[in-house]
Design a protein with these regions (language model features):
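Single conserved hydrophobic/aromatic residue that forms the stacking wall/gate
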Residues: 1-15
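Hydrophobic Val/Ile/Leu positions in short beta-strands of Rossmann-like dinucleotide-binding domains
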Residues: 13, 30-31, 179
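NAD(P)+-binding Rossmann beta1-loop-alpha1 motif at the extreme N-terminus of oxidoreductases
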Residues: 17-68
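Rossmann-fold NAD(P)-dependent oxidoreductase module
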Residues: 40, 44, 148, 193
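Rossmann-like NAD(P)-binding element
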Residues: 73, 77, 81-117, 124-129
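Rossmann-fold NAD(P)-binding glycine/threonine-rich loop
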Residues: 122-165, 169
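Active-site-lining helix/loop region of Rossmann-like oxidoreductase modules
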Residues: 175-241
Length: 241
């Protein structure tokens, strides 16, 4: 049997730090790395041995993002580039821009993504009703990215249900990550990266299933609004084989 357990801040975080990696790994380019999610992933993956590149629409914005990152985590090395150059430099590329900029950003860097894994964290929230599920006509933001980029890019959707600002803290996050994508090997590589960042990832099937993870975000927002828990997330439970 497999189930889903809701977790909140009082049970989701333990007072222990994640282990740091020592071996050099792929260069990770984070496009739109100015928010909590991009910053938190940069910190955690740098500790795990990845070289980090922060991309933005302009070099100045990228440099400002790196400066802000260093204020939070001075020991995290990161290079600033425009999105186009960052996508070229990254062996694995992560898209963390707001949903309204997803398509334009991907279109501008598409030629530099061929043969690579693109981790798409987009959640298609539509203000002001962010607590209501409003998926795009394509079915999900993840599927929209895959259709836009074509099969030569391995789109993997993940991180939609993580309380992003917690990633910047030096703590273990017990909330799980649902990972969808059409290539199992690409999903597995992303799951390994999730584990290196101190979380647990699960194979959740093809990119069509990204709709479920994206929709869950609005449900978690409603649960947070209840005041019973904060930073709610999910935990996959079941009997191990």
């Amino acid at each position: 049997e497999i189930g889903v357990r809701l977790v909140g801040s009082e049970m989701c975080i333990r007072d222990r730090v994640m282990s740091e990696g020592s071996n050099a790994k792929e260069t990770v380019a984070i496009l739109g790395g100015t928010g909590d999610l991009g910053t938190g992933l940069a910190i955690r993956w740098s500790k795990a041995g990845h070289k980090i590149v922060i991309g933005s629409r302009t070099l100045e914005k990228a440099q400002a993002a790196v400066a802000a990152l260093h204020e939070i985590s001075p020991e995290t090395p990161a290079e600033a580039m425009e999105n186009f150059d960052a996508a070229k430099a990254g062996e694995i590329v992560v898209l963390t821009v707001p949903a309204e900029h997803q398509e334009s950003t991907l279109s501008s860097v598409k030629e530099n993504l061929t043969g690579k894994i693109l981790i798409d964290v987009t959640v298609p929230l539509v203000p002001p009703k962010v607590g209501t599920v409003q998926l795009p006509p394509e079915g999900s933001a993840g599927k929209r990215a895959q259709e836009l980029l074509g099969e030569e890019v391995m789109v993997v959707s993940a991180f939609q249900n993580i309380a992003a600002h917690l990633l910047k803290e030096d703590i273990q996050i017990e909330c799980d990550v649902l990972v969808t994508g059409n290539k199992k090997a690409a999903r597995q590589r992303v799951i390994e990266m999730i584990e290196s960042a101190g979380m647990v990832g699960w194979h959740a099937g093809p990119i069509d299933n990204a709709a479920a993870a994206e929709a869950l975000t609005s449900i978690l927002i409603q649960i947070n609004r209840s005041g019973i828990v904060s930073h709610s997330g999910i935990k996959i439970i079941g009997q191990e084989h």
